[in-house]
Amino acid sequence: MTIYPAIDIKGGRCVRLTQGRAEQETIYAQNPADVAMQFRAAGSEWVHVVDLDGAFAGEPQNLAAVQAIVAVGMKVQFGGGLRTRAAVERALALGVSRVVLGTRAAESESFVGELVQAFGDKIAVGIDAKNGKVAVKGWVATADLSTLVLARRMDTLGVATLIHTDIGTDGMLTGPNLAAQEALCSAVKSRVIASGGVSRRDDVVNLAKLAQRHANLDGVIVGKALYERRVELADLLSLAAAS
């Protein structure tokens, strides 16, 4: 199981939001690339980067910061405002290893299919769940679509990786929604990366146990717990490598 430490960028800075609310923002670092260097020093191969301004605006707003993170030498999984093919191509041209589609994936299966045909496993889809429905446009709106229905559609299109975020637990440090993660893993063959709620080492232990039952549970994104020093990245990486 892969650990993906998270960097959320807003106004060029590293921040965390609570349940995606722009007004509940905590600034953790002025330079996101410095944070990426710390993650790399701890032994992380991957970093999960979200352009929050891009998610709200509908197109990436912090590509210079993303490029600086790529230059650190990590594999970057990047999302936030990638709603056109041109935006996806710009991100990949920066050296991003995997892009995450969100809003547009819920709106257009043909768009996803076209990108999967062109870029293969560099395309991931973020499935952001709010009470079982898909949240879109920076989580400020909800589509009339269940998360499991969208997941199955993406699986059928050949999307290699699904990133499943439970918004109710995101940034709350209350523990992940294991039942929701298990339900999604059971519904698809795609790799699943769990996101939302990790607050302590045992949360990752429990996800690793879930991954033993569901081989497609491929990773977990850890954000606020790292910044609040509830967990140590090097410890989580060792735990994941042993599971």
From Swiss-Prot:
Annotated EC: 5.3.1.16
GO molecular function: 1-(5-phosphoribosyl)-5-[(5-phosphoribosylamino)methylideneamino]imidazole-4-carboxamide isomerase activity
Entry protein name: 1-(5-phosphoribosyl)-5-[(5-phosphoribosylamino)methylideneamino] imidazole-4-carboxamide isomerase
Gene Ontology biological process terms from the UniProt entry: L-histidine biosynthetic process; L-tryptophan biosynthetic process
Keywords, comma-separated and alphabetical: Amino-acid biosynthesis, Cytoplasm, Histidine biosynthesis, Isomerase
Source species: Opitutus terrae (strain DSM 11246 / JCM 15787 / PB90-1)
PANTHER family from the UniProt entry: 1-(5-PHOSPHORIBOSYL)-5-[(5-PHOSPHORIBOSYLAMINO)METHYLIDENEAMINO] IMIDAZOLE-4-CARBOXAMIDE ISOMERASE
Pathway, per record: Amino-acid biosynthesis; L-histidine biosynthesis; L-histidine from 5-phospho-alpha-D-ribose 1-diphosphate: step 4/9
Family annotation (SUPFAM superfamilies): Ribulose-phoshate binding barrel
Cross-referenced InterPro entries: Aldolase_TIM, His_biosynth, HisA_bact_arch, Isoase_HisA-like, Isoase_HisA-like_bact, RibuloseP-bd_barrel
